[in-house]
């Protein structure tokens, strides 16, 4: 009471001078609680104290302030056994608790009740409150309430919040995601994630101790994690918490041990959006409003290929008790997957690796082809155009090295078209192979870990000069080159291509010979 003021007046001082309630003034029995109920807890218009629904939901009312301060006092000092009793919600079948008639202070002391939505969640405790017992009718002990009582005395509904947080993949580059929990991506792609939770009702929670943090952990294959927007409802918050009440603090730690599956490198990125400033200093907290955090990450060359993918998790840290006890609850894990592909160039016998062969690769989407290039240093992919690159072009040309190989790691599942655009030195350029293929993963029963990846040709126009390996070489396409026409198969589509090409060359040669002969004549 001594810590409370109403209308600028100290409540304890006012009580001590009121002869109607302070027994020391008149020598009668002291009634401090009666004074509080009659003089302090009533709202404007002299409303009766039993109309408390709005009073309890408003942290600024005297009734709420008194309960909050009494709760803090109770936590730091002992209460005699003869002045307290244990109440239990839903006791027996009626929910009734036996206690002395009077006015009781009710404080939730439930320890770590587990949530029903998430086994790791812990429901927040109900706020402290003041509650009157039912009034006993002195002439009829079996009557439920004293005759003429208008208030619903002796009953309270305790509402414990079970906090939760959600996370979704919403975009890959500029395209909407086709799944909210797992996505295919290339190295170099930018992934957009959306985190959502709800602002709790902090009525009765001590200012300065309220906790609300959204904690994002990105696996080591996801870099450049950037928070692009934080909103409460439709209001965008500022990163600088000191700017105004609509602020938050952003914390980043890039040297955390990755707790996700088999990703154990010590460079996972932990990003914390701390809303402590908003929930502790804002007088108009939007309780029940949706908190939306948008962030991006880039798939880089450290990305896990297939397997468990590249997970991204989220946790919510919140105040479990009105005194500010903190607890964390996990949200869903979302994953980004990427896959290997490589080329191995050989002679027709398959026993000699060939360097200097040039290729182009296009992503096929509904028969539309978009050619791609890959940065040699970062391994990041980017789109070019629908036009096939020419041999020796600056972008989009992949050349076999001395071992005859080209690594094209970091591709999403889907369909591709590979073109050989330049033969190795000493090999014919007639009928250069091109082929389409698909990358198709198979997941475990949980749908989170890739157990196998199938690489399959979807065209057969190469004269069986292209084949995928098995086991460890399943992602490698062996492509054979012929030195001359006699090594090329002359059946099927390839045979037609060769005959047409040779025919065109012969026609061109014949036309040139005829022109030369005419000029000599």
Where are these regions (language model features)?
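Solvent-exposed loop/turn and edge beta-strand elements of beta-rich ligand-binding domains
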Residues: 1-521
């Amino acid at each position: 009471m001594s810590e409370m003021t109403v209308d600028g007046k100290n409540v304890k001082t006012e009580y001590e001078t009121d002869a109607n309630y302070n027994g020391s003034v008149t020598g009668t029995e002291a009634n401090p609680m009666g004074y509080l109920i009659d003089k302090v807890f009533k709202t404007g218009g002299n409303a009766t104290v039993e109309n408390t629904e709005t009073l309890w939901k408003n942290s600024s009312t005297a009734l709420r302030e008194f309960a909050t301060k009494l709760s803090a006092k109770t936590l730091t000092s002992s209460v005699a056994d003869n002045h307290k009793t244990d109440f239990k919600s839903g006791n027996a079948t009626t929910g009734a608790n036996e206690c002395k008639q009077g006015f009781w202070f009710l404080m939730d002391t439930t320890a770590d009740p587990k949530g029903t939505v998430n086994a790791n969640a812990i429901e927040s405790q109900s706020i402290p409150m003041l509650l009157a017992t039912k009034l006993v009718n002195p002439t009829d002990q079996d009557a439920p309430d004293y005759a003429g009582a208008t208030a619903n005395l002796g009953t309270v509904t305790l509402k414990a919040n079970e906090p939760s947080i959600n996370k979704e993949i919403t975009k890959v580059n500029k395209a909407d995601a086709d799944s909210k929990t797992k996505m295919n991506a290339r190295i170099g792609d930018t992934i957009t994630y959306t985190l959502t939770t709800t602002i709790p009702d902090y009525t009765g929670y001590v200012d300065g101790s309220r906790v609300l943090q959204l904690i994002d952990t990105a696996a080591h294959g996801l870099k450049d994690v950037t928070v692009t927007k934080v909103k409460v409802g439709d209001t965008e918050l500022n990163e600088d918490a000191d700017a105004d009440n609509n602020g938050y603090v952003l914390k980043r730690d890039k040297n955390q041990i990755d707790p996700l599956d088999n990703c154990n490198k010590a460079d996972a990125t932990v990003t914390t959006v701390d809303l402590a400033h908003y929930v502790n200093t804002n007088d108009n907290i939007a309780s029940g409003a949706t908190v939306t955090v948008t962030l991006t990450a880039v798939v880089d060359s450290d990305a896990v290929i297939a397997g468990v993918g590249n997970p991204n998790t989220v946790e919510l840290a919140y105040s479990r008790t009105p005194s500010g006890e903190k607890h964390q609850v996990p949200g869903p894990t979302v994953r980004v997957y990427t896959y290997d592909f490589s080329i191995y160039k050989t002679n027709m016998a398959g026993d000699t690796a060939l360097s200097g062969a040039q290729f182009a690769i296009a992503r096929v989407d509904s028969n539309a082809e978009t050619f791609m290039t890959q940065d040699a240093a970062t391994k990041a992919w980017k789109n070019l155009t629908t036009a096939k690159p020419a041999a020796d072009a600056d972008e989009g040309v992949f050349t076999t090295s001395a071992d005859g190989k080209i690594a094209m790691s970091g591709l999403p599942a889907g369909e591709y078209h590979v073109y050989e655009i330049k033969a190795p030195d000493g090999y014919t350029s007639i009928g250069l192979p091109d082929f389409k293929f698909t990358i198709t993963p198979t997941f475990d029963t949980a749908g989170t870990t890739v157990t196998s990846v199938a690489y399959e040709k979807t065209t057969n126009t190469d004269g069986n000069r292209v084949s995928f390996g098995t086991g460890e070489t399943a992602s490698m396409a062996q492509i054979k080159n012929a030195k001359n026409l006699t090594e090329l198969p002359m059946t099927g589509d390839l045979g037609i291509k060769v005959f047409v090409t040779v025919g065109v060359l012969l026609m061109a040669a014949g036309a040139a010979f005829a022109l030369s002969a005419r000029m000599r004549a």
